[in-house]
From Swiss-Prot:
One of its GO terms (biological process) is UDP-N-acetylglucosamine biosynthetic process. It is found in: Golgi apparatus membrane; Endosome membrane. This is Glucosamine 6-phosphate N-acetyltransferase. It catalyses: D-glucosamine 6-phosphate + acetyl-CoA = N-acetyl-D-glucosamine 6-phosphate + CoA + H(+). It is a peripheral membrane protein. The gene is Gnpnat1. Acetyl-CoA binds at residues 130-135, 165-167. Pathway: Nucleotide-sugar biosynthesis; UDP-N-acetyl-alpha-D-glucosamine biosynthesis; N-acetyl-alpha-D-glucosamine 1-phosphate from alpha-D-glucosamine 6-phosphate (route I): step 1/2. The keyword Acyltransferase applies.
Length: 184
């Protein structure tokens, strides 16, 4: 399989979020349909492998060495599950991915078999910080989780980032986030 423009999920979902429920302030005003001059907010596609997707992710954390075959296999798994909403911002003038964030839907037995949203891997490339793209991605995915009928949405962040997430009505939970790593 060769990389192409097939989206991970239906792009219309991003256009259908109820932007009137957005709680963040954008100055200048931007939105999922108008993210800024020369920018497009859309689902990840396999062609993004060659548009700097991993370069952007690498500014967040260690990505490791990922072969095109590994990327395609993971992409197809995520796409088929229907529960992964990897969203990117592309600078179409450069043909490069400049920001990304992921919404994962977790199916539960509690709350009458409800769904929980989880935000992961929010990162904006160094060159594009200050253009509100992180805010745009988080606002969009938060509203998308509501549209997808999640009973709540959660994320983990470093203490110094709590203030940023509070702008979106996220609150610090009394629960502790615990982790056990198997890979170094």
């Amino acid at each position: 399989m060769k990389p192409d423009e097939t989206p991970m999920f239906d792009p219309s979902l991003l256009k259908e979020v109820d932007w009137s429920q957005n709680t963040a302030i954008f100055s200048p005003a931007i939105s999922p349909t108008h993210p800024g001059e020369g920018l497009v907010l859309r689902p990840l596609c396999t062609a993004d492998l060659n548009k700097g997707f991993f370069k952007v992710l690498g500014q967040l954390t260690e990505t490791g060495v990922v072969s095109p075959e590994q990327f395609m296999k993971s992409f197809e798994h995520m796409k088929k599950s229907g529960d992964y909403y990897v969203t990117v911002v592309e600078d179409v003038t450069l043909g490069q991915i400049v920001a990304t964030a992921t919404l994962i839907i977790e199916h539960k037995f509690i709350h009458s078999c409800a769904k929980r949203g989880r935000v992961e891997d929010v990162v904006v490339s160094d060159e594009c910080r200050g253009k509100q793209l992180g805010k745009l991605l988080l606002s969009t995915l938060t509203l998308l989780s509501k549209k997808l009928n999640c009973y709540k949405i959660t994320l983990e962040c470093l203490p110094q980032n709590v203030g940023f997430y509070k702008k979106f009505d996220y609150t610090v939970s009394e629960e502790n986030y615990m982790c056990r790593r198997f890979l170094k």
